[in-house]
Curated annotation (Swiss-Prot):
PROSITE patterns: TPR_REGION. Belongs to the TTC19 family. It comes from the Eukaryota. GO terms for biological process: mitochondrial respiratory chain complex III assembly. Gene3D superfamilies: Tetratricopeptide repeat domain. This is Tetratricopeptide repeat protein 19 homolog, mitochondrial. TPR repeats lie at residues 97-130, 137-170, 228-261, 270-303, 310-343. GO terms for cellular component: mitochondrial inner membrane; mitochondrion. InterPro entries: TPR-like_helical_dom_sf (IPR011990), TTC19 (IPR040395). Its main location: mitochondrion. It comes from Drosophila melanogaster (Fruit fly).
Length: 369
């Protein structure tokens, strides 16, 4: 979901998929990577795969694929090595567990959430039957991520807390990347539920711990990825608090971090650039917002992702409107509407229609004057 309207500018965000309601900020639509905003995000990547989710703060164009599909696919592959090799000639209990976990992840990718939950409960019983501590922890983590994906935040936090207890019992410390990944997710969910103080404290603590880790392991890509994810989510919180300059700086730091990990051409970069443009709009720096959106659109062309381009075009139209460039605003919003219809993207169509209505309202107001 992208933030829709320049006032809504910072409204809807991504999933992995998730984010703040952009309408609270301005009127631009956030890009969306995950269903609940989160998605970047990347959002709900499970612990064992050491991934992170990103979201944005405008109307966010839906990333190709389902919520965090890439990361769930990674998780499915990861389970192959979770318990070590197995005899190909005979299906062992461990193999049956791995197969069940993989099926549950495929269900999540297809957004068959009820079926996925049933499969995970079955996997949990199987892991308990063979007394696999790693398997039990992994399944609980997947359950928590599924609940987060479904916006069942209270349930997700409870399960994540149980996972943390298990990790501590296994010898992990507060500096463990797995602990910090969960801490970041809990802080993000607190923000989405409106507990801004808890969210602020959680992000502040998590970033402090990650900074210490990076001093020891500056080239660790998993930690860098989590650092970028957490800064992006923290930036969304600051946007909600009206701290636009601080948010913009965090988004830029997150962007630089992710480029270091992935390179410039990736969905996460598009999402964060969209967030940066939202911050600029709220700071009334429209030229900077425009340039940032144009940079994001160049990336969507390299990614061949026309679905995101529609929302970005609508956001660009709203920036032109703020600048008083009516002709450019109308052209951008009409192109956004066309792209939204062509690629069956209701978020882009809605944002484009909002933009066109704003142009009409502005022109009518000028005529009356």
């Amino acid at each position: 979901m992208l933030v829709r309207n320049i006032c809504k500018f910072t409204q809807v965000m991504g999933r992995f998929r998730v984010v703040v309601n952009p309408r609270d900020y301005c009127h631009l639509a956030p890009l969306k990577r995950s269903r609940y905003h989160q998605r970047s995000e990347f959002g709900c990547r499970p612990l064992c795969s050491n991934a992170a989710g990103y979201e944005v703060s405008w109307a966010a164009p839906p990333a190709s694929g389902s919520s965090g599909g890439m990361f769930w696919a990674f998780s499915a592959a990861f389970t192959l090595n979770l318990f070590g090799g197995a005899d190909e000639k005979e299906e062992t209990p461990e193999e049956k567990l791995i197969k069940t976990i993989k099926r549950s992840i495929l269900c999540i990718q297809r957004e068959q959430y009820d079926k996925a939950e049933q499969m995970l409960h079955l996997a949990l019983r199987m892991a308990q039957d063979i007394q696999s501590k790693d398997g039990i922890t992994y399944v609980f983590d997947l359950m928590a991520n599924l609940a987060m994906e479904r916006e069942q935040f209270k349930k997700a936090e409870k399960i994540f807390t149980d996972v943390m207890k298990r990790l501590f019992a296994e010898g992990h410390t507060e500096e463990s990347p797995k602990i910090l990944h969960i801490s970041s997710k809990i802080a993000h969910m607190s923000q989405l539920q409106g507990d801004l103080e808890k969210s602020f404290q959680g992000f502040t603590w998590t970033l402090q711990q990650l900074a210490k880790l990076l001093e020891k392991m500056p080239d660790d890509k998993d930690i860098l990825e989590l650092y970028g994810l957490t800064k992006n989510w923290f930036g969304q919180l600051l946007m909600k608090q009206g701290k636009y300059l601080e948010a913009k700086n965090l988004f830029k730091e997150a962007f630089d971090t992710l480029i270091n990990v992935y390179g410039a051409v990736n969905d996460a970069s598009v999402t964060i650039l969209n967030n940066i443009s939202v911050a600029y709009v709220n700071l009334e720096k429209y030229a900077e917002a425009r340039e940032t959106l144009l940079e994001a659109m160049e990336l969507t062309k390299e990614l061949k992702d026309a679905t995101q381009e529609g929302i970005l075009q609508a956001n660009l139209g709203l920036v032109y409107l703020r600048e008083g460039l009516m002709s450019q605003a109308e052209n951008a919003c009409r192109l956004a509407w066309k792209l939204g219809k062509q690629h069956q993207n209701p978020d882009a169509v809605e944002q484009a229609e909002y933009c066109l209505n704003e142009i009409k309202t502005t022109l009518n107001g000028e005529k009356r004057q």
